[in-house]
Amino acid sequence: MVIPEIVKHPLFELVGVGVSNPDKVGRDVGEVCGLDTTLGITATDDIDALIALKPDALVHYGPTAAHAEENINLITRFLRAGIDVCSTAMTPWVWPTMHLNPPNWIEPITAACELGEASCFTTGIDPGFANDLFPMTLMGLCSEVRTVRASELLDYTNYTGDYEREMGIGRPPEKKAMLETPDILVFAWGGTVPMIAHAAGIMLDEITTTYDKWVTPNERKSAKGVIPAGNVAAVRFTINGLYQGKTRIQLEHVNRIGDDAAPDWPTGNQNDVYRVDIEGTPSIFQETAFRFTDGSGRDAAAAGCLATGLRALNAVPAVNDLSPGWVTALDLPLIPGFGTIR
């Protein structure tokens, strides 16, 4: 999805592409991406060959944190070679100092950055820029923030990612989802809550969670199949940063199968949005919708995925300019998208 955007960008030069699917190895990258032309770059699974190209950065769209060992092994090889990494894979790394990040996830990256004098930046959409860059930028327009909430309000009807075991969508309500366990939920999604607290100069009292399910009274169809009546077709969870006994920072998700699911739960002014609600002086309310308007027919989920990939790509020059080590959204300057207007 990102490669076609790289090849036409005036700032970036694609020098190599690594793949994990054996069926893609040895094929021209243009063919792999379904482009009308070849690129003269062969997809490879040879990491040493990619490192030998001496790129300015690896933009890494690897698997999720469920594959931590694989991700860490690959990323550290590039960092030790002095190659900066901008990744969307290990989302707990959006805030590396979060207390739930295990040392064996953090220490190898720290050591590799020191050895190679390289930097490692992790981003995403949520957790990521929709609940770190967006709310913190808007907080900078206030004299006082009483509460700040960043919400993902998405219809998962066309989403094909994993959510049954993780969220409980599509399953009987009595089956406990992985994310109903508070520490797992905070670990997977909550890194931006302590990040915002740090940026605001406060120390949270504690982080709490809520998790609710909505059971569909009728059968529903999605891209992944049929959800029978009586099963979960929407979930709502919150991760809450408490300060002075009150929830001051909140991350919220409402994910549903069908716009009419869980009608009493929050929705956007249009479907599929990321929203920031700040109660303060002044209060600010912002909704962001990612869409394709090029007639391609690609949906909002695909637009959000592309934006996520491009956040990592566009961060490369700024990350190159930083001192070695971990990089978070708080370390980056404004990234206005040089070369995007052409």
Show where each model-derived region lies.
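Rossmann-fold NAD(P)-binding glycine/threonine-rich loop
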Residues: 69-76, 80-81, 89-118
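Active-site-lining helix/loop region of Rossmann-like oxidoreductase modules
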Residues: 139-264, 272-274, 302
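C-terminal active-site/capping subdomain that shapes the small-molecule cofactor and substrate pocket
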Residues: 222-342
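Alpha-helical support elements that line or immediately flank enzyme active sites
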Residues: 129-141
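N-terminal glycine-/serine-/threonine-rich beta1-alpha1-beta2 phosphate-ribose binding loop
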Residues: 1-81, 201, 304
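Short, ordered loop/turn segments at secondary-structure junctions
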Residues: 20-22, 63, 83, 90-93, ...
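Conserved active-site and cofactor/substrate-binding residues in soluble primary-metabolism enzymes
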Residues: 1, 45, 53, 73, ...
